[in-house]
Amino acid sequence: MTSSTTGDRRWGTTRRSGMTILGKVAVPKPINLPSQRLENQGLDPNVEIVPKGTLSWGSKSSLNAWGTSSLSPRTESGPGSPSHLSNRPSSGGSVTRPSTADSNKAHDSSSSVAWDSNSRPSSASGVFPSNQPSVALQRPHSADTRPGSSQLSRFAEPVSETSATWGQHVAPEKLGVAPSKNDGFSLTSGDFPSLGAEKDTSEKSTRPQDAGPHARPPSSSGRSVEGQGVDCTEEANDRIGDANSWRRENQPYSEDAPRHCREEGQLDSRGSQSYPNANFPPRYDAWRGPPVNNHQGGGWYGGNHPYGAPMGPGGFHMDPFPFYPTQVPPAPGHGAGPRGNHANNERMFRPPMLDSYVHPRMQTRPGFYVGPAPHEGYYGPPMGYGSPSNRDLPFAGRPTGPHAYNNHSGQGGYDTPGSSVSLERNESSHSQETQRPYKVLLKHQDGRFGEDNAKREEFLGNRLPNAEKIAQQMQTSRNERREIRNDASGEVQPVKAELAAPGDPSLIQKIEGLNAKTRTNDGWQNSSSVVNRDEQESQPRTLNSGNSANKVSARNHRTGHASDSKNSSHYNQGDSATNKNAEPAAMGGTSIFRRPTQQTQGRADPQTKRIVNSEGNDAWQKTTVMSGSSHTTLATNTESFREVNVDDSLDTESIRRPGSGISADPKDNQRSTMRELARQRAQQRQKEEEERARDQRAKALAKLEELNRRSQIYEEGSVKNMEAASNASPADMPTDPGSHSSNATNSVEPTGGSGKNTTQNTRTSTEYANNVGPSQQDNLPRDGGASKQKRLGYKQKQNIIFEKKPTGSSVATAEVFDVVPSPEVVNEGVSSNNSDMPATSTVSAESTFPKRKNNRNGKKKHKAEETATMNTTRVAVGKETKSGDESIETARARAAEIELGSVSVPSLDIKVSGDSSEQISSFTNEESQNRAKNNWKSQHVRRTQRNSLVNKPAEKFSGNNAVIWAPVHPQQKADVSTGGGSQTTVPEFGTSSKSQHQGQTSSKSKRVEIERYVPKPIVKEMAEQIVSKNLVTSAPDMSENVNQKENRGGEGTGILQPSGSTAGKSGSPSKSRHGNGRQGKHGREHASWHQRGSGAPTKALEDGQFVTSNQPIRGTVNYHSSKQTEQIAAKDQTTCNKDGWNDGWYMTPETHYSAAEEMESSAVGKDQGMSMHGRQHASRSNKDGGSNYGDPKKGNKRDFNKAHTQHSGHGFSQPDLPAASKEGRVPGDHVWHTANRTGKYGGRESTRDKPYGSQEKNVVGYEHQGFTTEQKTTSADTQAQLQNRSTNKEVQVEQNPNSMFQKNTGQGRRFGRGQESQGGWGLPAQENMHHHHQRPPSNRDRQKQNLHYEYKPVGSHTYDGERSREQSKESSQTEGPRYREKGQGQQRQGGYQQQRGTSGRNGGHGFTGDRN
């Protein structure tokens, strides 16, 4: 614009007229004319170029383009553009680039660039693509600069299109006009004058800012202003079109040229302006891409291609000063230059050799690089890459190297005595010391202390004035420590001697003297404070050495032992930890306690940590052990001591250790006095804490006793334990662990006592420590990580619990539970687990605690976590096994326990069933375990996601799902076998199931742990044995088991299929092994799928706990039975139908249903939620298992026929159901029906219909409904209805699988209804539906829900089942078992049918209720 006013001297007037036209008309005619004139007149150095393209057309279009309105659309932009183009080609075209080197031309380079845009069209003819980069750069700038630039940009694209020679003409016109229209004033006053005012230095100065960086083609200096406006546009165009070619020419710089248009201002600030001389084309970092400056004349950045290898000195075009010694200060500025762009990201857009390639040594780039002298032929990365010190260092003459990129630490000093090095040393010692506990553990002797002293000395070496003093200090400290250690080691067992050790005034005095000396030598003026701290430290140490030492003695033994079992590898302390702990304790509670405190806080305090670790890594970890194991006592003591010791021990130890060898008499005396005072205080504190520890021990013993009672009392114990655990204060918790330690061993006092007792205590304490919860586990940082130890604590907890368990102290387990975070879970676990369960309870508590930890993620995570915990438990068992004999014993005991869990669990459950409370509790545990186990297996089986989903619903129904409970089911089985007792227990259980829900979680974990093991080998054995029993001993048992399994298969299939699905996975895989591979596969899928749905229905079934009663065995048996029973199913379906029906029916936890009703209601609601998950999960299953189901439909239709028959004979179909439900959801669905019906549908039904009939209906209807209903359906009416309904349902389900799947939030219901309807439920459900049509809709809905599984086989299967049932009635083998089932069912069906009629009637209500 200044150019316009200043005007081109020649065409300025014309241009002004043109400008006027442009301004008014937005017709840049004058521009083209002037620019053409200039070019034609040879004003532009690039006129050569222009003639190629721009000149000729420029001449033509000069007035024509301007004048030609038709062209003016394009010519509008064009003329101005042509001017620009002409100018740019002129500027960029020929000599401009070299002239760009001129500062003026550098300034003009913008105009030149603009001209480059013009010349670009001319260049488009191929003249100077290099100008185009600047043009392209110009464009963005002008686009940014001028409001019309966007239009210019628009036109720019056409220009790039038209950047052909004529296109240049037209496009420039277009550009010129359109901008003039849009920016008429801008183009008129600014752009066009820019074009015209190539001579205008004002334009130059104006544009050079933008163009300066671009100033490669500065030839058109006067045009720079024009270039600013139109240039950027044209540049944009050129950049779009030609810039590529231009860039190709001068790519290193051409890239920047466009950038410069965009980033012109930036680049100027970064680049050209970085260079003091505008004359020098600004250098551009390779990373930035060769700046536009790369113009022939202007490329400072003469360096190799930005990506090219760094060029040797002088290799750069602008390297006229090859290898300048870096006259410029080595570090330009941290953000200086493009290096700033490289920024600390260290992202090199270009090779590290950015400006260094251009040796920025040239002072032209003042602050930029001194130019790194190539070190060994390597140019250090541009200083800008790293922190300035690092990056600049290479240039500063410091070693260049990748460190410059990544090593910010290099700042502090490669050589820099700056604290970084010393700090690193200190930190290194610190970190080493921090790590040293492990090393020290290995050494845990004077040598270690020597190292620690050496480190301290080394550390202090920086601090201490004299190495001699340091050496003395080291010597003194070592000797002192050795003495202390020797004393301590001598007193390890008699920890109380340890008190004497800390009480030993000579040692204390020595230490104090050394510390005082150290402080004095260190010049520490705060000797008094130090002394006070030392005194305090001594006191805490003394106290701690007394109390903590005692506890450490007991707990360290405990911990040592626990550490042996759990942590021997972990700590490397193991027994040595006990020794160490005992030693440090004996050594002087001072250092021990101090270390615990320091550990607690030393961890927080690196220096203290270093010092503490240096001095007493053993003690430190011992302290950690103490902290973990003794933390109960130490929790309070350590906290108080921590307060004292943290400061005291930190400062004192820091002081003492550093200055332990140094002597300062006055301060020494003061310090000695202070230390004596501190010692006295510490002794007092020790005494207090000892008393406190005694009190806590007494409390702990009381609690242990109480816990023992509670563990024996199960539920009562659980409640009490929950209350106690919940009520237990952290101190109480520690006390509990302490008490448990002492109680468990009853020899906590073995502080100076026997190692065995101490070991037992240690174990107990360790258990407690582990179980005490995160706080103690936090204190257990032995691992070096509180969180790790927390988690490890869980694992360790499990391991320890197992240890205890092998030790046979259920009480210890109970104790652990008490200490375990979740009183409910723990208590339930404890209460539910007497002997076998304690480990399970521990696992449950442990699982629960991880759950709590993971509660943040919710149900899914909890279950997955339960599963993980269960897995961890297993792992823990393995770890225990690894850890030692005790661990092995634990593993063995656990294995036996697991066997009991599956095989013995029935007896255990039966045993428990003798005590309905216990049974409930155990049942709950088993439930929980089954559920968790199912989760675990599912998770374990790769169903984790689904299982997680299932686990969520299951988590919702944690109680209910737990109620599905294979182990309990074995109890129930036994109970069922027992008869009403089981039934009564089941009702109790059902009644208690809610309360059990709480405990079930822990129980679930426990039982999961048990079942976890049970399902695989034991479940096999159980399956075989139980199947054999069921087959051989009694078809009723088998039927019962099968019914239970089937119920459980509904649930157990749902849950067992988590568990039985897992069992179906492990069990169904066994089935697969047994030849039910499909089912196994589907079972696995179904397992997770089923778990979900199963979890809900299972939970519902949990409500309908008859399933529970059947289910425990079924959980156990279901694996086998689902495997073998599935095989046997056909055989034993009749038997299963009898017993299974009786069981399934017999299991009639009508009472359970009452409890189950409530549970059911919640379970149903949960189930629905679960169904939603189940839906999704089922949806997945349909996706996964849907096709699988498709296949299973066939196989599972078979199986379903089998399983359906079995399902009718519910028991074997249920075993199949894990697979069949998985594969052919019908049995599974049927089971689910039963589970859902029973649990959910039937549960409510039964809950409503609590009447046995309802339960039976649910149970029998579930397990037998296919069967029993078939039996009843034997009535053509019912059967026809059922078939029709099944068909209809099947059709409906098929029609509505997704709708129902999506529709029925309660997939459990869907499972229940759909599965019921479709699954063997169909007939009974239809019969029930027949009796109660409300229920049929529910069944339909559930069928739909089932269909959500796409279990056409389910619906079809149900239909098939019905037909199969009919056929079974007609046919006897596959259908024979069905028939048998039916027959048996029918046998029962008389009563069952009656009851079922009642149940159907009631069930109708129940179904209505369930639906409601």
UniProtKB/Swiss-Prot annotation:
The modification Phosphoserine is found at residues 72, 883. InterPro entries: BAT2_N (IPR009738), MOS1-like (IPR038808). Residues 197-207, 236-267, 478-488, 665-713, 877-888, 1006-1023, 1191-1202, 1222-1232, 1242-1251, 1338-1351, 1359-1369 have a biased composition (Basic and acidic residues). Residues 850-862, 1071-1084 have a biased composition (Basic residues). Residues 1-276, 384-437, 472-798, 827-888, 909-1144, 1156-1412 are annotated as: Disordered. It comes from the Eukaryota. Keywords: Chromatin regulator, Coiled coil, Phosphoprotein. The keyword tRNA-binding does not apply. The keyword Cytoplasm does not apply. Disruption phenotype: No visible phenotype. Residues 667-717 form a coiled coil. Residues 1400-1412 have a biased composition (Gly residues). Residues 56-103, 120-135, 517-531, 539-553, 565-581, 610-639, 738-749, 756-779, 829-847, 914-938, 983-1003, 1056-1070, 1106-1137, 1266-1286, 1293-1307 have a biased composition (Polar residues). GO terms for biological process: chromatin organization. Residues 109-119, 1384-1397 have a biased composition (Low complexity). Involved in the regulation of the chromatin structure and DNA methylation at the SNC1 locus. Regulates the expression of SNC1 at chromatin level. Interacts with TCP14 and TCP15. This is Protein MODIFIER OF SNC1 1.
